[in-house]
Design a protein with these regions (language model features):
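Mature extracytoplasmic enzyme cores
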Residues: 1-196
Length: 196
């Protein structure tokens, strides 16, 4: 274990009493001591890409320099931290969707339930799982509202529980009402709260 945290609050104001210091292992920060015996303890760690040191990168700003959707998708794969849906378009009218964030390969488990570190389950932090992307779909339309966009073959890497798609269906229907959209019509869609 090593320690992390600080004994000061924002702007250097000292804390009276308890210090904000935690314990961290190669897995991540310690979040709970489940049981403790004389020589053995059962503990829980938080293993999350946002808590990895390499997640504090700012490569998302390279999207500002991407010249087309292909470059945008490539830049997005280097943007670590928690995964996010990323939808993009370029000046030529091409569109794309992908997922940002580091997606480690899971070895020996699918991520749907917590696993003990003592098992054979591991994360390969040196290699990423296959990253889904959709570029220039036949429909000519991309939309996402935390619903499943990628095929089921990506479920072991990114998860199996998605929004049921009510909001995404509404967005699809509103997009279909016009052949072309501008900033105002897209803002209207974003602010729409109806579900039909």
């Amino acid at each position: 274990f090593d320690t992390f945290g600080t004994k000061e609050r924002l702007r250097g104001a000292p804390i009276d009493g308890e210090a904000l210091v935690g314990l961290r292992s190669t897995l991540g920060p310690l979040v709970e001591v489940v049981s403790q015996e004389e020589e053995e303890a059962t503990v829980r760690f938080a293993v999350w890409t946002a808590l990895r040191p390499e997640s504090a990168n700012l490569t998302q700003f390279q999207l500002l320099e991407a010249k087309n959707v292909d470059e945008g998708v490539a830049v997005t794969s280097t943007w670590f931290g928690p995964s996010q849906n990323v939808v993009m378009a370029d000046a030529s009218g091409r569109i794309g969707w992908t997922i940002s964030g580091f997606i480690p390969k899971r070895l020996g488990f699918d991520g749907s339930t917590p696993v003990p570190w003592s098992s054979d389950c591991r994360w390969d932090w040196g290699a990423q799982a296959p990253r889904p992307s959709v570029v220039d779909p036949e429909s000519g339309v991309l939309f996402t509202a935390n619903n499943r966009v990628a095929g089921w073959e990506y479920a072991p890497a990114i998860g199996e529980n998605w929004d049921p798609g009510y909001r995404a269906s509404r967005i699809r229907d509103l997009l279909a009402q016009k052949q072309e959209h501008d900033e105002q019509s897209l803002l209207d869609i974003a602010l729409d709260t109806r579900v039909e």
